[in-house]
């Protein structure tokens, strides 16, 4: 999408702010706002520690406290509607720019409800000296240059169109694996 946004923000905030109230019906805006603060603010810790905290939020929801006008209340704000997947908003962005230690542009980002869960790095098979290893090196470079994007990462994908592999931010290149089907066989990625 062509979106006017702050490049320092890796989230697709417009979508996130629209979807959270829809999948958390019955919760007041104060609870949603508190969850937004929590998922946008990570103080201290390594990238992996921040990613683990976000993964907990993604799986279990964000525990929040808010004032309802009479008393302090607590709630759990879900980031994804696992019960009704069609209530979630899926977006793929081509060339998503993030300004971290420097400005970088990831080839593709897969967003779920405005959360950048998948980073895809593509390399051209027509370039002789380029392969999937170069895509891995580029992903590692992004983790150093724009670490805020990878706080929210579920997994990364690298491809040179001859080979497509997926792995996590902690995986070495040898731990990135080819796509498999439900029965455990490998998908043809040609």
Annotated model-derived regions:
Residues 1-190:
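An alpha-helical interface "stripe"
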């Amino acid at each position: 999408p062509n979106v006017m946004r702050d490049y320092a923000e890796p989230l697709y905030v417009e979508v996130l702010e629209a979807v959270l109230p829809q999948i958390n019906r019955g919760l007041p805006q104060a609870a949603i706002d508190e969850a937004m603060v929590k998922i946008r603010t990570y103080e201290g810790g390594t990238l992996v520690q921040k990613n683990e905290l976000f993964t907990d939020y993604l799986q279990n929801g964000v525990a929040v406290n808010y004032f309802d006008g009479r008393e302090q209340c607590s709630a759990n704000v879900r980031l994804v509607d696992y019960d009704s997947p069609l209530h979630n908003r899926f977006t793929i962005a081509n060339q998503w720019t993030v300004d971290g230690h420097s400005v970088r542009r990831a080839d593709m980002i897969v967003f779920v409800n405005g959360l950048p869960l998948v980073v895809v790095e593509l390399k051209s098979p027509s370039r002789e000296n380029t392969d999937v290893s170069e895509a891995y090196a580029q992903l590692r470079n992004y983790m150093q240059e724009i670490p805020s994007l990878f706080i929210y990462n579920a997994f990364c994908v690298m491809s040179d169109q001859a080979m497509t592999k997926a792995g996590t931010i902690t995986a070495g290149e040898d731990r990135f694996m080819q796509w498999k089907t439900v029965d455990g066989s490998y998908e043809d990625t040609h």
